[in-house]
Amino acid sequence: MPYVDRQNRICGFLDIEDNENSGKFLRRYFILDTQANCLLWYMDNPQNLAVGAGAVGSLQLTYISKVSIATPKQKPKTPFCFVINALSQRYFLQANDQKDLKDWVEALNQASKITVPKAGTVPLATEVLKNLTAPPTLEKKPQVAYKTEIIGGVVVQTPISQNGGDGQEGCEPGTHAFLRRSQSYIPTSGCRPSTGPPLIKSGYCVKQGNVRKSWKRRFFALDDFTICYFKCEQDREPLRTIPLKDVLKTHECLVKSGDLLMRDNLFEIITTSRTFYVQADSPEDMHSWIEGIGAAVQALKCHPREPSFSRSISLTRPGSSTLTSAPNSILSRRRPPAEEKRGLCKAPSVASSWQPWTPVPQAEEKPLSVEHAPEDSLFMPNPGESTATGVLASSRVRHRSEPQHPKEKPFVFNLDDENIRTSDV
């Protein structure tokens, strides 16, 4: 979508055919400067390029004879395509959509319209002479190939010396792949599978770094709970995730200073810990991001809810209620079969059965002997049995504040007693 910048120039992204009838389109950033009487295109937005990086192509507006929509016969497989006729040469360009196509055609026709000067104006001849001598120098710029590197977070372009035409052909596919990857209007449904909530909005924006304050192009994705940005559209793991519950305000950045002063379509996302400065490609894109983030934050405040995957995480969290609700069933599953069978056959006498807590006896109290013990004491475990069943009843051992006294008789039961049970023998 073309927009007007601070210098009253029409700017925007278009795809231009590399060579006529080649069918190979490259992504470029176009600037229609009516004051300089030329149409320039760059590798990217000049604000994002290194200092001194010039245009990769240019065309004088006085050489343009006609701008029209390409017919299906000219470009049958290229939608939203229009052609610029200039100096017996045709430039085929592809827009993003139908409205973008119409706006560019009208702007170029309006800028290249021939105006008849008033009588007695001599500077027109000198202007024409300047225009005639300028194109040869401008046309030499696209012949220079650059190698783009990121050194210390700064984009550096180094000219490459070429021996013949093979070097240019070899480096063009890499540049072409990089440019196609930076498109902001390609849908994301086919590249990265959505594992979380559905996306509300996604696209490329330019973000300011936190440490070096450098500007880098990142792929942003907004859903119902977070806003994430990735290094490229194909990445699965985001570089950073901003929870919407931490977003305090999102609005257009009107008060600018320093590096922010030259940034168009700039908005800021204010959170509790940091302010993010993000630059969109057009004013419409900027307002769309602001409205989308604001609506998502408002919806989260009015109807607070958790992501759908939080329930599955809480099930595996240690110490959760689902694990502690049935400790006996989990422990019983982990017992060996032999020990479990032994515990079942001696259920009346094992220490794992429920017993109330016994308080600490006073110093003057005399401990009960085995002969005078009450009848319930017969169900207490023997000294030998307490060690055998200690593994099973480690979590439910009855509290004893005083060690047991040694027994006079090794066998506490009377075999002549008629009330003795066979399970205790």
UniProtKB/Swiss-Prot annotation:
Domain PH: 7-113, 198-298
Source superkingdom: Eukaryota
Protein name from the UniProt record: Pleckstrin homology domain-containing family A member 2
GO MF annotation, one: PDZ domain binding
One of the record's GO cellular component terms: cytoplasm
A Pfam family that the UniProt record links to this protein: PH
Entries under PROSITE patterns matching the protein: PH_DOMAIN (PS50003)
